[in-house]
């Protein structure tokens, strides 16, 4: 981990140095660097004669759905659902845009903890909370009865919440996050094929 140096981080590019080699991933997210290095080390162990050119050719095909996946200009979807993941996500977006993101969250009903509430308060310019019909997702009643969530705009219908987020005048990053349960809703709204990859 200490040997990884991120050189450049953009919405569609992560440029990293590892030992004396340089690699580029076609997807944002600082956590991708560790995943890439793990893949590189594994492939080098299996194929002793592989070149950096061949490795880069493989990395050019890199696609990880639901991980800082760009859905539209300045709009991302990420399955981050705990304080560690949300902290990395918001830090990465701040690094790229130099401003706090606007967020839309749908949460599992076991994820409301003080650390994540603190991130909601401090790491976002604005936050919208929504829900979907699922026994595992925080429901309207749960949200309304949780005092720490009452400071945020609640929009029960996820499609309406997505529309509001998309159309809101804001020149910084916007991110939908909190669960892989909402992937099919997000993909349908942004007209992405849900079959592009498993989440």
Tell where the protein language model's regions lie, with residue ranges.
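Short alpha-helical
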Residues: 2, 63, 83-84, 110-112, ...
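Glycine/aspartate-rich loop-and-adjacent alpha/beta segment that forms the canonical ThDP
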Residues: 180-199
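Short hydrophobic/aromatic-enriched beta-strand-loop microsegments
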Residues: 101-102, 125-130, 174, 194-199
């Amino acid at each position: 981990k200490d040997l990884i140096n991120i050189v450049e981080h953009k919405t569609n590019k992560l440029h990293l140095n590892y030992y004396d080699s340089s690699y580029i991933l076609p997807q944002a997210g600082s956590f991708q660097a560790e995943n890439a290095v793990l893949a590189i080390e594994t492939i080098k162990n299996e194929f002793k004669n592989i070149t950096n050119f061949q490795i880069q050719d493989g990395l050019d095909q890199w696609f990880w759905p639901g991980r800082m996946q760009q859905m539209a200009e300045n709009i991302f979807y990420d399955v981050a659902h705990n304080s560690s993941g949300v902290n990395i996500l918001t830090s990465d977006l701040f690094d790229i845009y130099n401003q706090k993101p606007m967020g839309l969250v749908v949460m599992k009903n076991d994820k409301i903890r003080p650390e994540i509430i603190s991130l909601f308060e401090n790491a976002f310019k604005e936050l919208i909370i929504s829900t979907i019909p699922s026994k595992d997702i925080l429901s309207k009643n749960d949200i309304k009865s949780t005092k720490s969530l009452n400071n945020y705009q609640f929009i029960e219908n996820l499609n309406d919440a997505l529309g509001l987020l998309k159309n809101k005048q804001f020149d910084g990053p916007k991110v939908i996050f909190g669960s892989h349960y909402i992937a099919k809703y997000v993909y349908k709204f942004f007209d992405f094929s849900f079959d592009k990859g498993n989440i």
